[in-house]
């Protein structure tokens, strides 16, 4: 004890004396705004420092959210709202919090269904404040009043919280329910808790929770260009609305001259339009079919043009020969067409310009009393008409001609005969034959006849000049020879045109058959030649390999002269298949089905498919079509 007392006596006592007038020194870092001004003017209480610090943090998080395009405070004037916080005029803050543009009432303006829940929560909190005394408090009778600054700052933070876009929030505030039923989310409960805060510490807690729940990586302030991986130059950076990744307007391709307005998507997030494109196999088949149809149409048009040209040439040659045999043409010559029989029992005809030289032919003229000097035996000389009229005959009911006996067929042969009619000048050989000697089934009985018809003769029908039979009266002299020459020339021309048309029809049928074979489901073994690498011994067994692609190529190049060559190649393809493959294999079965299909289609198209695959003896040569 003596030692302790000795130590205390030697210890300087003045170190324990504290002067009462020494002003306290504040050791804190000054902040911006109101806190900085207050620190310069004098000492500030701890509660005021918390208030000023909270105002600065609220302004800072609001500015980062706004500059980073993560959201905005839903107030009429943002600058007025910020100035109210900076100047500590908290009464100017709006009483309404808006969420995504829609006004959301606070406190007493809540919906009816939430009033009871809200009121019960407030009553419970007030009851806890009134009934539960603090451990350090000495007054247990009066509750502590809530500061107005706490209420205003809580409302400001709630407005910021409601202004943040929901897609930029993460847990715990971003776990909204995805069910169809509207439920109270964590964010709503957090807002209720914030508005019921009674101290600055509670507001600080809600502020830190909000700061941790925001996706700051999506902010444009922290955005990196997806192309160049660089920050900065925010004025030239645009965010994709799909992935929220930044892109400089000069880094995207094609370059942008300015930041586009509205929604913008990067090339990866751009909505892709589905193109209704067919698979390559179907597209190739459709294209080839269209080309084949076009080629067929061109061939048919060219064939029709050639046939018309040949018919016109044959008609021109016939007219030239006839004009050479006749006298020089005169002006005013009229073409006369005589209907041989009418249903009314009368036949009309046109007479020449001088009817006084003609003579009407009636059944009385058919009696054996010839008047002219002609040498016909059983013919009745017709009155000579003007050379301008080739055929003339008239039967009228005025002369007492009955319907059955009034039919007179007048056939004029171009050629000068020896017989002369009773008229002026030198007449031409004309032959009249009574209708009594004409059979009812004869093709000449009910058909108008004219040698000057300009109508083209169909390819499958013989011209009218060929319908003259030897049973009719034959012309005499040179006219007979010339007429027979004309008939033979016309027969040869028609035979050539019909043969050519038949050959072209066969080749078009072959082309159609190839297309049908390629489209068939069982054509897969025959589409292309067998590869020697896959089947090495195939070419040792098969000496003449062939496939549908080769046949189709030969058809397109018009290498087949007749349909029999095409049919031989098709049968060679099947014989190769049956020779190499076993009869129970899939290839052989497909070949059998395809062969039966080919035979059926060929018969429907009019092609002759013989079992021995031999070509016909005579097939008219086919003319190659011009492409």
From Swiss-Prot:
The keyword Flavoprotein does not apply. Phosphorylated in mitosis. Residues 287-326 have a biased composition (Acidic residues). It comes from the Eukaryota. Residues 386-395, 402-412, 486-496 have a biased composition (Polar residues). Residues 270-503 are annotated as: Disordered. One of its GO terms (molecular function) is zinc ion binding. Its main location: nucleus. CDD domains: Bromo_Acf1_like, PHD_BAZ1A. A zinc finger (PHD-type) spans 222-272. It is found in: Nucleus. Residues 272-283, 417-431 have a biased composition (Basic residues). Residues 348-359 have a biased composition (Low complexity). One of its GO terms (cellular component) is nuclear chromosome. GO terms for biological process: chromatin remodeling; positive regulation of DNA replication; regulation of DNA-templated transcription; regulation of heterochromatin formation. InterPro entries: Acf1_Bromo, BAZ1A, Bromodomain, Bromodomain-like_sf, Bromodomain_CS, Zinc_finger_PHD-type_CS, Znf_FYVE_PHD, Znf_PHD. Belongs to the WAL family. Regulatory subunit of a chromatin remodeling complex, which forms ordered nucleosome arrays on chromatin and slides edge- and center-positioned histone octamers away from their original location on the DNA template to facilitate access to DNA during DNA-templated processes such as DNA replication, transcription, and repair. Involved in regulating the spacing of nucleosomes along the chromatin and have the ability to slide mononucleosomes to the center of a DNA template in an ATP-dependent manner. May play a role in transcriptional regulation. This is Bromodomain adjacent to zinc finger domain protein 1A. It comes from Xenopus laevis (African clawed frog).
């Amino acid at each position: 004890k003596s030692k302790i007392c000795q130590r205390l006596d030697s210890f300087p006592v003045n170190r324990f004396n504290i002067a009462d007038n020494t002003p306290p020194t504040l050791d804190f870092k000054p902040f911006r705004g109101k806190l900085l001004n207050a620190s310069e003017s004098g000492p500030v209480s701890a509660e005021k420092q918390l208030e000023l610090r909270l105002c600065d943090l609220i302004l800072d998080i609001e500015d980062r959210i706004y500059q980073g395009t993560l959201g905005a405070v839903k107030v009429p004037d943002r600058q007025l709202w910020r100035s109210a916080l900076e100047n500590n005029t908290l009464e100017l803050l709006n009483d309404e919090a808006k969420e995504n543009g829609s006004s959301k009432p606070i406190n007493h303006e809540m919906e009816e269904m939430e009033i009871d829940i809200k009121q019960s929560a407030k009553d419970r909190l007030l009851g806890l404040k009134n009934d539960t005394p603090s451990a350090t408090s000495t007054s247990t009778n009066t509750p502590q009043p809530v500061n107005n600054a706490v209420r205003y700052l809580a409302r400001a933070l709630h407005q910021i919280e409601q202004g943040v876009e929901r897609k930029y929030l993460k847990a715990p505030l971003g776990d909204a329910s995805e069910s169809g039923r509207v439920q109270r989310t964590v964010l709503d409960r957090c807002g209720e808790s914030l508005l019921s805060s009674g101290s600055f510490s509670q507001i600080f807690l809600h502020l830190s929770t909000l700061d941790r729940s925001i996706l700051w990586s999506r902010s444009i302030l922290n955005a990196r260009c997806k192309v160049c991986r660089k920050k900065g130059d925010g004025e030239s950076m645009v965010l994709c609305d799909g992935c929220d990744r930044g892109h400089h307007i000069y880094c995207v391709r094609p370059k942008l001259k300015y930041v586009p307005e509205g929604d913008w998507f990067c090339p990866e997030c751009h909505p892709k339009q589905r193109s209704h494109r067919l698979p390559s196999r179907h597209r190739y088949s459709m294209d080839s079919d269209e080309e084949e149809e076009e080629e067929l149409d061109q061939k048919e048009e060219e064939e029709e043009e050639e046939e018309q040209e040949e018919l016109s040439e044959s008609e021109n040659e016939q007219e030239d020969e006839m004009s050479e045999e006749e006298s020089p043409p005169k002006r005013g010559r009229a073409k006369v067409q005589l209907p041989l029989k009418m249903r009314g029992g009368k036949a009309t005809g046109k007479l020449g310009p001088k009817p006084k030289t003609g003579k009407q032919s009636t059944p009385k003229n058919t009696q054996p009393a010839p008047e002219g000097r002609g040498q016909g035996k059983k013919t009745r000389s017709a009155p000579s008409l003007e050379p301008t009229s080739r055929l003339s005959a008239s039967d009228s009911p005025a002369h007492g001609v009955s319907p059955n006996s009034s039919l007179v067929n007048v056939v004029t042969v171009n050629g000068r005969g020896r017989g002369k009619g009773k008229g002026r000048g030198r007449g031409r050989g004309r032959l009249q034959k009574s209708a009594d000697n004409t059979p009812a089934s004869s093709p000449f009985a009910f058909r108008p006849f004219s040698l000057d018809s300009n109508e083209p003769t169909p390819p499958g029908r013989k011209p009218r000049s060929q319908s003259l039979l030897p049973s009719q009266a034959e012309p005499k002299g040179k006219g007979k020879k010339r007429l027979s020459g004309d008939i033979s020339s016309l027969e040869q021309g028609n035979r050539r045109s019909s043969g050519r048309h038949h050959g072209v029809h066969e080749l078009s049928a072959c082309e159609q058959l190839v297309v049908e074979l390629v489209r068939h489901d069982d054509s897969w073994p025959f589409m292309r030649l067998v590869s020697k690498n896959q089947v090495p011994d195939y070419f040792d067994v098969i000496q003449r390999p062939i496939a549908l692609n080769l046949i189709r190529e030969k058809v397109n190049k018009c290498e087949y002269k007749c349909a029999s060559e095409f049919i031989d190649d098709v049968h060679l393809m099947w014989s190769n298949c049956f020779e190499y493959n076993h009869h129970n294999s899939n290839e052989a079965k497909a070949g059998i089905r395809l062969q039966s299909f080919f035979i059926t289609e060929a018969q429907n198209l009019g092609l002759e498919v013989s079992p021995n695959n031999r070509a016909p003896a005579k097939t008219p040569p086919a003319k190659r079509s011009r492409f």
